[in-house]
Curated annotation (Swiss-Prot):
MF GO annotations: metal ion binding; RNA lariat debranching enzyme activity
Recorded superkingdom: Eukaryota
Signal peptide residues on this chain, from the entry's feature table: none
Taxonomic placement: Eukaryota, Metazoa, Ecdysozoa, Nematoda, Chromadorea
UniProt-annotated stretches for the region Disordered: 1-25, 453-500
Cofactor dependence: Fe(2+); Zn(2+); Mn(2+)
Subcellular location per the Swiss-Prot or TrEMBL entry: Nucleus
Protein's name according to its UniProt entry: Lariat debranching enzyme
Length: 500
């Protein structure tokens, strides 16, 4: 996409340096006029969150005050950093001197509540021990929902699909097996994308006769689909990030399976982060005239610091009676049932049905898109609304920052009641339980189950003081310890995603 194309939008917003400074204008993707029986909803999207939830919510409030509207949903595209207490910091793949508590712990403890429904995927800098409790997603705090390793859920009847983590070839074919305590390697592999997750997401594609629809409204990933710069102004991108060109040309920039996901699922919007630059692209789909699906509008956003383009507002049309709440997607639930045997919890390479291998797959079936009969079975589950009252604190909340609260051992791994309830309800394997049962070591009693005396007991002491230094950016996207990037994003405008 050339930056010379005309657009009707403003540049994406940066943060604010002080409480009295207005944010820069945000990009606003505006759909066609609302028809009878429709209403508009507004979704705020941010790139890497880096634990800066206070600043992100404050920026949203300023935008709302300036423009006279309210956001209905916030989407965060990874590096969310859901750190509950200082014990979670060793579970983050960040050098110890850069580990910082940030502000999520306030929302986990109940000191603050997210002012808007918040949805996020995982990146490569996460409190992985906590997220591993929720492989299929769940509430990490009141009003804040994690999508799990891969998921498709609905909001206002919009279908939102998400893929957590970043690509690494060495771990791509393995099942998910990591949980605390993490080895030095496992704390990195825990956030690596798995082929089984992408295989499940590809089953969201439409039936073979449907060539014109966009089955997914919004798709999220942390790193970029490999090859996406070819669909945008890549010359501009390579001027801004001079090391990206070599990675792109060698096929190392982003997830090499990402474009297949775009072509299979044809999302209307694809939102990403990770590379700390705002970049737009437009991916066309096959067809002509009225028989052609909408193109996929790709947008990656920056990190939340002053002057950087880290937030975008989407205006989307939905049905007048659409409920502004999260619900499970029937097709995704059926896919989880259909592919249940691919959940193993052990460190093994998975042979998927669409792979050529000398080893047999556990399934003879090749196509796991749900049949009409399988979807009827999902209907028997009843109401698919995601309950908002199922959150429970598994690790102790941090209620006061003291020296003793900093000097604690790494957090244990916990049985999460949300995972137990979801898997029992759907009738699928419970990866959280499988990981708990691997060994009794480093398995803790969930905080919500403890008596007050237990909760007030002094924890085992550790000599590590993690400190509160600001987080430094991740320095790459395809290796365990990537090299530093040389160039930085300046304040030029980028081309915004056009509307129809």
């Amino acid at each position: 996409m050339s930056s010379k194309n005309p657009v009707d939008e403003q540049p994406c917003c940066g943060s604010h340096e002080g409480s009295h400074q207005d944010p820069a204008p945000e990009t606003l993707v505006v759909e066609k006029e609302v028809n009878n029986g429709e209403k508009k909803i507004r979704i705020a999207v941010v790139g890497c969150s880096h634990g800066e939830m206070d600043a992100i919510y404050e920026t949203m409030t300023l935008i709302e005050q300036k423009n006279g509207y309210k956001f209905d949903l916030l989407i965060c595209c990874g590096d969310y950093q859901a750190v509950r207490n200082y014990g979670d910091l060793p579970h983050m793949s960040i050098p110890p001197k850069y580990r910082s508590l940030q502000t999520f712990y306030k929302y986990y403890s109940g000191e603050q509540k997210a002012p808007v429904l918040t949805l996020f995927i995982g990146g490569n800098h996460e409190a992985s021990g906590y997220l591993c409790e929720l492989p299929n997603g769940g509430w990490v705090a009141p009003n804040i929902y994690y999508m799990g390793f891969a998921n498709c859920i609905r909001f206002a009847n919009l279908r939102i699909a998400g893929l957590s983590g970043i690509f690494s070839q060495g771990d791509f074919q393995f099942s998910h097996y990591e949980r605390p305590s993490f080895s030095e390697r496992d704390v990195k592999s825990a956030y690596h994308v798995r082929n089984v997750d992408m295989f499940r997401l590809r089953q969201l594609k439409s039936d073979n006769e449907n060539k014109i629809s966009n089955p997914i409204d919004i798709m999220l990933s942390h790193d970029w689909p490999g090859g996406i710069p070819d669909f945008g102004d890549k010359e501009w991108l390579f001027r801004k990030k001079d090391l990206f060109e070599a990675d792109h040309n060698s096929g190392k920039l982003g997830n090499p399976s990402g474009m297949k996901l775009i072509y299979d699922c044809r999302p209307r919007y694809y939102l990403a982060a990770h590379l700390h630059i705002a970049f737009a692209a437009l991916v066309p789909h096959k067809g002509s005239g009225s028989g052609r699906p909408q193109p996929t509008r790709f947008l990656s956003l920056d990190k939340p610091i002053p002057g950087r383009k880290f937030m975008q507002a989407l205006e989307l049309n939905v049905a007048d009676d659409a409920k502004l709440e999260l619900s499970y997607d029937p097709q995704w639930l059926a896919i989880l049932r259909n592919t249940d045997l691919l959940t193993t919890g052990t460190k093994e390479q998975l042979i998927l049905p669409d792979m050529a291998s000398n080893r047999p797959c556990v399934y003879e079936r090749k196509d796991f898109r749900p049949t009409a009969e399988e979807l009827k079975e999902i209907e028997k589950l009843g109401d698919l609304t995601i309950r908002t009252d199922s959150f429970q604190q598994t690790a102790p909340p941090l209620k006061e920052i003291t020296e003793s609260s900093k000097n604690v051992p790494p957090s244990a791994y916990y049985r999460n009641p949300q995972s137990a309830e979801f898997c029992q309800w759907l009738g699928i394997r419970d990866l959280n339980q499988m990981l708990v049962e691997k060994t009794s070591e480093h398995v803790g009693t969930p905080y919500y189950m403890m008596t007050q005396d237990d909760a007030n007991a002094k924890p085992n002491q550790d000599d590590v003081d993690f400190g509160d230094e600001d987080f430094v950016i991740d320095r790459g996207h395809t290796s365990d310890e990537p090299e530093a990037k040389k160039s930085r994003l300046d304040e030029d405008k980028f081309e915004a995603v056009p509307s129809e």
